[in-house]
């Protein structure tokens, strides 16, 4: 497997092992209304401090137990105006690089610094992840290639699951120099991809609209399927006579009927073939809504109509912070909710080590309230 090399890699490749264990000290807790209260024994945690040390501190209790990890790390676009300092020139990062990387750190490019920062954190996140768990990482084009490369190395190329494309803008940016960048990526890796199974997404009203019942079939709504397929089938070549008398000599060139002639006649006898209103169409097997799965397999293209856009996220943050905007690139609540719907169970442990405005925690609490679950963050 090809690996990515950068200045400082040799110094950080095993740095996660050198990070000291810190004891997490419980300072205070909040009740369900967000008010400060006495310790209520909640297992949810918001940890304040260096996330590298925080991740190491979680290992004794949570190694191999976290079902779903979502992180939104710095995109490394050169923006210095936010809490994580997007071009990785934060004084704390500089100090850390000097201590860990040494003099080489003085010659690091922006990308070198970002990789040095991310690598040990990903190593610890991999240890925390459950065998049947998955990590979702938001990123854009600036570091997508580098992130995919080091994730291949940390999690194993065989554990790559998907690259989700989130369309984050609902209108083009007229100030764009070349193209209006309307999407971000969400990179998905499993601890063991063969053991990870996503939850299916609820069927939407739009998807269900494809099911109709033009012949008033007592079995209810259905949609037509294509009888022909390109996969070779030894029994998939035969002529068909329509109710109108039209003869179809066989499937289209380069394709085969999906079922044998015997099976086709069984389906037709059971009223599961649609010939069109005049009985002259190429036959189409019916797929009944009552017989399909309750949900659909998650897709890799997420539209802003489904999961929100950047303006939604900013409105949500302003409503929390009395009109202030302390975070430049928040993620909408519905985006995080979609990830948790796919990747968590009702009693899962969920981790976000670049927590920002706390949208992940918000989503966990709301989902628990909605379905009576016991997810923890």
Task: Describe each region flagged by the PLM.
Residues 1-70, 75-120:
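DnaQ-like (DEDDh/DEDDy) 3′-5′ exonuclease domain used for proofreading
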Residues 4-6, 13-14, 91-92, 115, ...:
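Conserved S-adenosyl-L-methionine
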Residues 36-60, 311-349, 366:
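Glycine-rich adenosyl-nucleotide cofactor-binding module
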Residues 54, 58, 117-122, 128-129, ...:
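Phosphate/ATP-binding catalytic cores across multiple sugar-kinase/actin-like superfamilies
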Residues 64-82, 151, 350-364:
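Conserved proline-anchored active-site loop of SAM-dependent methyltransferases
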Residues 103-104, 108-163:
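Conserved Class I SAM-dependent methyltransferase catalytic core
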Residues 161-188:
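Class I S-adenosyl-L-methionine
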Residues 191-318, 322:
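Active-site-adjacent helix-turn-beta-strand microarchitecture at beta-sheet edges
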């Amino acid at each position: 497997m090809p690996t990515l090399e950068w200045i400082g890699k040799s110094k950080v490749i095993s740095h996660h092992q050198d990070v000291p264990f810190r004891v997490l000290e419980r300072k205070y807790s909040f009740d369900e209304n967000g008010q400060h209260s006495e310790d209520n024994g909640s297992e949810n945690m918001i940890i304040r401090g260096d996330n590298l040390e925080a991740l190491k501190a979680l290992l004794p209790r949570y190694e191999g137990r976290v079902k779903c990890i979502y992180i939104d790390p710095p995109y490394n676009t050169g923006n210095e105006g936010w809490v994580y300092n997007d071009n990785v020139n934060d004084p704390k990062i500089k100090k850390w690089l000097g201590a860990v990387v040494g003099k080489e750190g003085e010659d690091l490019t922006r990308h070198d610094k970002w990789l040095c920062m991310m690598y040990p954190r990903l190593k610890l996140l991999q240890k925390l992840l459950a065998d049947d768990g998955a990590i979702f990482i938001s990123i854009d084009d600036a570091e997508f290639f580098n992130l995919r490369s080091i994730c291949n190395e940390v999690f194993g190329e065989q554990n790559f699951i998907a690259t989700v494309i989130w369309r984050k803008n609902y209108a083009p940016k007229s100030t764009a120099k070349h193209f209006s960048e309307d999407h971000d990526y969400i990179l998905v890796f499993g601890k063991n991809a063969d053991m990870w199974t996503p939850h299916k997404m609820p069927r939407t009203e739009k998807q269900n609209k494809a099911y109709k019942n033009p012949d008033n079939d007592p079995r209810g709504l259905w949609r037509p399927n294509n009888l022909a397929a390109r996969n070779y089938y030894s029994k998939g070549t035969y002529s068909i006579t329509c109710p109108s008398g039209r003869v179809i000599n066989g499937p289209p060139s380069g394709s085969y009927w999906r079922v044998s002639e015997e099976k086709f006649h069984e389906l037709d006898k059971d009223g599961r073939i649609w010939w069109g209103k005049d009985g002259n169409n190429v036959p189409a097997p019916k797929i009944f809504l009552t017989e399909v799965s309750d949900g659909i397999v998650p897709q890799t293209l997420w539209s802003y109509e489904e999961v929100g856009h950047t303006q939604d996220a900013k409105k949500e943050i302003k409503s929390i912070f009395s009109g202030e905007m302390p975070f430049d690139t928040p993620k909408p609540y519905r985006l995080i909710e979609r990830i948790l719907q796919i990747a968590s169970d009702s009693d899962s442990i969920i981790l976000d080590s670049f927590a920002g405005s706390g949208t992940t925690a918000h989503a966990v609490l709301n989902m628990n309230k909605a379905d009576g679950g016991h997810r923890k963050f």
